[in-house]
């Protein structure tokens, strides 16, 4: 079994005075978790494998602030950083990579213009491009867009529909088919968030995570729903995720990265020191 990664996710809101890490349920009811650079330093010191920064403001004005946050973080931490949120152009990707990001995650732009994935991976390399899939279960399995049926946590059959704009707009695209397309277009990794689970702390959506992992050969990062370190174990053992993303359980001090890794190691999951 390959070494599994633990990745704290920092959802950042940006203002004229800098950035603030926040966390909510399904991207609403946001609660402040602190300064992004300070949190990043803490996770670096605790042994996180990577960091993900998501600019949830995603405004033109905020982009310069995000670049400043990434530049300051890059001078303090020495683990790979992935940055996303509202990225629409090759120029934005270039600026963020120059600021110190190692990878870029794209979501809505990729759905609206799939060839953007190919263009970005051709220019920067597929290892730099992480495509995020936000999806939500849809129990209307007779929908003509329903290409793959997956069982939900409650046992009911459903297909998973890609959603964009932070989960506000359904697309009619089957998430498993979209994952295959993403891989074909050159994305190096998938970051999968089930909106059914996001922010609930009831655990990752294991069924769709496992189904997408089985449909593609590129790594899949499980995201959305971590409430305990046992949920991370489930993501690795049951869903066979390559990495587990978590936010609030780390931000608010419920667990440290070290505690998560010790627990996983004791249960036979290979993790880095």
Curated annotation (Swiss-Prot):
GO terms for cellular component: cytoplasm. It catalyses: 5-[(5-phospho-1-deoxy-D-ribulos-1-ylimino)methylamino]-1-(5-phospho-beta-D-ribosyl)imidazole-4-carboxamide + L-glutamine = D-erythro-1-(imidazol-4-yl)glycerol 3-phosphate + 5-amino-1-(5-phospho-beta-D-ribosyl)imidazole-4-carboxamide + L-glutamate + H(+). Its EC number is 4.3.2.10. Its main location: cytoplasm. Keywords: Amino-acid biosynthesis, Cytoplasm, Histidine biosynthesis, Lyase. CDD domains: HisF. The active site is at 11, 134. NCBIfam families: hisF (TIGR00735). Belongs to the HisA/HisF family. Heterodimer of HisH and HisF. This is Imidazole glycerol phosphate synthase subunit HisF. It comes from Methanocella arvoryzae (strain DSM 22066 / NBRC 105507 / MRE50). The gene is hisF.
